[in-house]
Amino acid sequence: MQYNGKSQQSINKINCIIEKNQSNSIINKFQVASPYDDYDDRLNFLETIEKNSGFYNVLCELFLPNGYPDSVTTDYFGYQFWDSIQALCSTITGTLATRAILKGYGVGDSSATVASATTQWLIRDGMGMIGRIVFAWRKGTDLDCNSKKWRYTADILNNIGMAFEMISPLFSSQLFLPLSCIGLIAKSICGVAGGCTKASLTQHFAKRDNLADVSAKDGSQETAVNLVGMLLSVIVSSFINDNTSLIVTWLVFLFFTSLHLFCNYRAVSAVQLKSINRYRAYLIYDYFIHNQGSIPSPSEISKLENILFSIKELDIRVGVSLCNIYKVQQKQQKLNNQFLQQKLNNITKTKNVNNNNNNNNNNNNNNNNNNNNKNNNINNINNNINNNINNNINNNINNKNNNNNNNNNNNNNNNNNNNNNNNNNKNSLEIIKKIKKSKSFIIWKKHSQRGNKILEKDFTLLIALLNGSTTRDMIESYFYAVEYFHLSSVQIPPTINISGTFFKRLEEKGWDLDRALLNSEGWTFGI
């Protein structure tokens, strides 16, 4: 229970304080007496709101967390609805698989022995335990960040395991044990993946630190669904007996298996996780690029997610690899120099064309003047000749001066470019040194360092903000740029800069950012 503030409300012209529970339902009313009365008499109990004892409210109290729907996230009902249906289908198919396994053990066969059945049962259980341990060792760290994917994969493996159990009695006794072991291994992996991801999803649904309550009510829902599934399984088993054809049995199994996969997909798709893994980060940046800098919400990204087949190689690269930062900078500088050189060549060509046109026009004008002035006196001819000579001399002098100035400018530009290259290279080396010494950054795959050599594969996607204003300014242009281009392109590659407000906007949209590696002043974004 909680008190919904201390505001007073007027009900039937009586000042009172209303007490509400977590589901925002009124449970008690207290009359507010005069402030001049004694302290003990200021609050008078007015009435208690009796709870509705209807069947619907009883079901809500039995199977829904306390305070529903305010105590859980908005996607809770959609997930639980489809998850309950898929659990029902799984119970029915599990009954058919168990029936096939018992038949393979020799139930109903007078020649079968108890010792043989016990030995086979123990071997199956042992193989399942080994498969559970190996899977937890290999994929345990991936279950948290890809909980939706593994939640759906777990049910696929469960169906594969039951399919192997269904076909195992159809073969000889020598193949029954290996096929049934494969089926149990798949179901054991489903138990690990499904159980771990279920815990992760339950933590997501628990909105008010009510993880235990949400988990307990989820267990109650699952138990009730299993009871209903057992009743339906008894009905299905009564129609499917030893005299039923194999085709009918498999049609029933495939129908409930398909329905199980469909409902499970709808359940996982309804979940709107707010944590950011590598795949969801790719979708966020892709949405950011193609929607003019707008930030997507968790519900929008949930609609774009491919649950089962996530991309393996990302065509958007955030920043540059730590090992390739120097090489990428050199390639970028070469592209810039090529672009500037091409621009200077075009400008020089246009200037030369203009100068040639001007000289041709001057020559034509001089010829016309000479033809028109043939009948003039000798003094005018001498003056024209002298003027032409002086003009040519001056033009030559000006051209030489212009050429010298252009050469000087080109030399200055080359010197400036060389100085910039040297400065950039020094900055790049300083960045690498500071990043190697710092621990305030996170990488997508793992923290791995063999000796003093940083492995390139461990720095595939990195977003960092280190301590110190100098370091921040130095690395900002490298790690806060989304580069979606190929370096072999002749054109200057486009970039979209992401400032520090980008991550604040992510938080405003409801995304949860992992800040476990926070330092005193810097902060880190990642998974």
UniProtKB/Swiss-Prot annotation:
One GO cellular component term: membrane
UniProt similarity note: Belongs to the RUS1 family.
InterPro entries reported for this sequence: RUS_fam (IPR006968), UVB_sens_RUS_dom (IPR054549)
Region annotation (Disordered) ranges: 350-426
Compartments where found: Membrane
Membrane topology, as annotated: Multi-pass membrane protein
Protein name (Swiss-Prot/TrEMBL): RUS family member 1
Gene from which the chain derives: rusf1
Species per Swiss-Prot/TrEMBL record: Dictyostelium discoideum
Top-rank lineage group of the source organism: Eukaryota
Disruption phenotype: No visible phenotype.
PANTHER family in alphabetical order: RUS FAMILY MEMBER 1, RUS1 FAMILY PROTEIN C16ORF58
UniProt KW Amino-acid biosynthesis keyword: no
Glycosylation sites recorded in the entry for this protein: 21, 243, 346, 467, 497
Taxonomic path: Eukaryota, Amoebozoa, Evosea, Eumycetozoa, Dictyostelia
Keyword Glycoprotein: yes
